[in-house]
C-alpha cells in the first residue's frame, strides 16, 4: 500500500483551485467566522453544501453549538477580508471590517459577497482532524459583481464572468 505523506498531499491540493469563502455564524454560542476553501455542493434536492472545519479551530465550539452558518463566497478585491478571517484577529475586528446583514437563520451575510448561502447544519461527519458539516440551504443572496475570487497555487486569483 502506498501511503501519501502530509506535505505531498498539501502540495497536490494546491493545484486544485477553489472559491474563497468566509463562513459565519451567530447564535447562543456567539458570533464567529473563518475563511474556508473546503466548501462544495452536495446535492440540489434538497439544496445542500458541505463545509469542512478543523475541530481544533478556535471557532469550532461556536459553530458546533449554533448549528447554523452562512457561506459567503468572496469577490475579487476582498482578499484583505479573507486574510483577516483566516488569521488570529479578534472576532469583533473581523466583523467590523465589512458590512453585514442578518440572514434568515440569524447568521451574518456579507453585503458585498458574490453569493451567500444561509444554512442550517443538518449532519456532521468526523474524518481525521476535521468535521464535515452538511448544510441545508434555507436562503440564497446573489450580488451583481462580475468578479469571483479563487485560491490556486497558494495565492488569490480573480475570475471574470463572461459577458451575457
From Swiss-Prot:
It is an enzyme of class 1 (oxidoreductase). Induction: Up-regulated by the nitrogen regulatory protein C (NtrC also called GlnG) and repressed by RutR. GO terms for biological process: nitrogen utilization; uracil catabolic process. Its EC number is 1.5.1.42. Keywords: Flavoprotein, FMN, NAD, Oxidoreductase. One of its GO terms (molecular function) is FMN reductase [NAD(P)H] activity. It catalyses: FMNH2 + NAD(+) = FMN + NADH + 2 H(+). The keyword Flavoprotein applies. SMART domains: Flavin_Reduct (SM00903). Catalyzes the reduction of FMN to FMNH2 which is used to reduce pyrimidine by RutA via the Rut pathway. Belongs to the non-flavoprotein flavin reductase family. RutF subfamily. HAMAP family: RutF. This is FMN reductase (NADH) RutF. It comes from Escherichia coli (strain 55989 / EAEC).
Amino acid at each position: 500500500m502506498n501511503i501519501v505523506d502530509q506535505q505531498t498531499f498539501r502540495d497536490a491540493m494546491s493545484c486544485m483551485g477553489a472559491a474563497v469563502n468566509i463562513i459565519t455564524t451567530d447564535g447562543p454560542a456567539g458570533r464567529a467566522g473563518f475563511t474556508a476553501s473546503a466548501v462544495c455542493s452536495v446535492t440540489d434536492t434538497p439544496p445542500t453544501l458541505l463545509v469542512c472545519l478543523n475541530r481544533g479551530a478556535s471557532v469550532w465550539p461556536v459553530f458546533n453549538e449554533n448549528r447554523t452558518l452562512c457561506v459567503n463566497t468572496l469577490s475579487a478585491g476582498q482578499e484583505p477580508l479573507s486574510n483577516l478571517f483566516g488569521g488570529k484577529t479578534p472576532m469583533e475586528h473581523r466583523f467590523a471590517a465589512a458590512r453585514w446583514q442578518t440572514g434568515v437563520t440569524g447568521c451574518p451575510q456579507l453585503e458585498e459577497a458574490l453569493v451567500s448561502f444561509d444554512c442550517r447544519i443538518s449532519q456532521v461527519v468526523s474524518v481525521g482532524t476535521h468535521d464535515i458539516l452538511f448544510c441545508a440551504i434555507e436562503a440564497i443572496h446573489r450580488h451583481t459583481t462580475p468578479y469571483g475570487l479563487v485560491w490556486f497555487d497558494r495565492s488569490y486569483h480573480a475570475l471574470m464572468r463572461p459577458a451575457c
